[in-house]
């Protein structure tokens, strides 16, 4: 009898544990959302031929809240501007496409005196919501518009966003019209052009200070990442190009030719065949990292196939554990790892590899100071010899 009671107690405890796990899982199973509004609840109205008006209604409904944007194709024929501190949580396959010419498809610029140290509500309370963000989505300028501009916030998060085919720029972080922004935290941003006719544009343009960018990829914007302002920190940012084909070729034709060249030995004959097709459109005049302003730090960043890997113009900058490479199959036969045009530059524990036999390691002019520490260089037009010379003269002022 005693054993039977004990067994009953054990069964009861097991059932109670199972019930607890079921209750804990219910919110997840129900697809609970933290959003204050969902774009799906704001359909197009009669006479509307694109999705911009419904976006505006949804944004208005989520002031200082979160707007959820589900998967879908969204035609945007006029600019979207967020001024009410509405954060955007977008499905990775939420594809916002510009269908008419405009400056930016999406601008996030909260209303308020962000130039001052502290922001106040109308009733005098301090406004200190530092959790504002844009996450997810594919913002496609479609060659008609720049993709995204961020302005006017104290601490802001940008994550898991794709920026396609920005006409002038993929992402611009700026003061805008009398605005101010610092402490942008950007992670897993993917900026890429996959259409022709956009040469001369910029993937990411940081015109403010105190921002942190991590795990950023920029592909086939003529200037990959431009950094101005001061004290910005970039970690594991990779800029490369060559997917947009040379003039006279289609994307599929160029992609197939490149794939075939990878599957066979790289011989002088194969090289001549690739070079005969011309230079991929976005590589002419390309700069992976355009460094301006003051006190910027680049850690583990990779300049991969550009005419200029790191262009440093004024101020002070640090390159630490960064890399440079020129892919010979892309056709660049003029490439320099570092072009130094002003200020002090510390290069430490970096690796430079010239793949096409033509690359230069370092070129300087103007008022510059180079500090060269424990770097590796090989290939190119004798980059190893250049590195030895730089090491001997480390700390010199040109």
Predicted features by range, described:
Residues 20-29:
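Bacterial N-terminal signal peptides
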Residues 43-46, 64-102, 139, 143:
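N-terminal extracellular ligand-recognition/capping segment immediately after the signal peptide
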Residues 69, 87-91, 114, 129-135, ...:
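All-beta strand scaffolds that present successive hydrophobic residues in beta-strands
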Residues 87-89, 108-166, 182:
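Parallel beta-helix/beta-solenoid
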């Amino acid at each position: 009898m005693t054993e039977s009671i004990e067994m009953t107690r054990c069964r009861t405890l097991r059932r109670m544990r199972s019930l607890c796990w079921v209750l804990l899982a219910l919110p997840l199973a129900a697809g609970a959302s933290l959003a204050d509004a969902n774009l799906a609840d704001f359909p197009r109205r009669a006479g509307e031929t694109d999705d911009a008006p419904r976006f505006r209604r949804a944004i208005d409904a989520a002031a200082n809240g979160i707007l959820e944007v589900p998967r879908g194709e969204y035609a945007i024929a006029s600019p979207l501007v967020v001024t009410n501190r509405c954060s955007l949580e977008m499905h990775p396959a939420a594809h916002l496409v510009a269908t008419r010419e405009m400056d930016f498809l999406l601008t996030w610029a909260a209303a308020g005196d962000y130039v001052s140290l502290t922001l106040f509500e109308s009733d005098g309370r301090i406004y200190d919501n530092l959790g504002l963000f844009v996450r997810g989505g594919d913002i496609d300028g479609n060659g008609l518009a720049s993709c995204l501009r961020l302005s006017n916030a104290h601490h802001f998060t940008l994550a898991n966003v794709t920026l396609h085919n920005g006409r002038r720029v993929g992402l611009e972080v700026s003061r805008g019209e009398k605005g101010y922004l610092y402490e942008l935290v950007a992670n897993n941003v993917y900026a890429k052009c996959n259409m022709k006719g956009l040469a001369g544009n910029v993937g990411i343009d940081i015109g403010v200070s105190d921002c942190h960018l991590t795990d950023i990829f920029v592909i086939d914007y003529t200037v990959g990442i431009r950094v101005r302002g001061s004290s910005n920190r970039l970690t594991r940012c990779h800029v490369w190009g060559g997917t947009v084909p040379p003039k006279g070729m289609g994307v599929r034709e160029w992609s197939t030719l490149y794939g075939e060249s990878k599957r066979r030995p790289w011989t002088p004959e194969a090289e001549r065949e690739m070079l005969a097709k011309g230079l991929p459109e976005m590589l002419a005049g390309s700069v992976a990292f355009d460094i301006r302003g003051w006190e910027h730090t680049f850690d583990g960043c990779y300049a991969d196939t550009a005419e200029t890997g790191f262009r440093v113009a004024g101020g002070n900058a640090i390159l630490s554990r960064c890399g440079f490479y020129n892919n010979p199959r892309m056709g660049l036969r003029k490439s320099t790892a570092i072009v130094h045009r002003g200020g002090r530059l510390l290069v430490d524990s970096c690796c430079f590899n010239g793949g096409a036999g033509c690359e230069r390691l370092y070129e300087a002019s103007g008022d510059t100071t180079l500090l060269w520490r424990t770097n590796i260089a090989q290939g190119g037009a004798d980059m190893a010899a250049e590195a030895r010379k730089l090491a001997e003269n480390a700390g010199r002022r040109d």
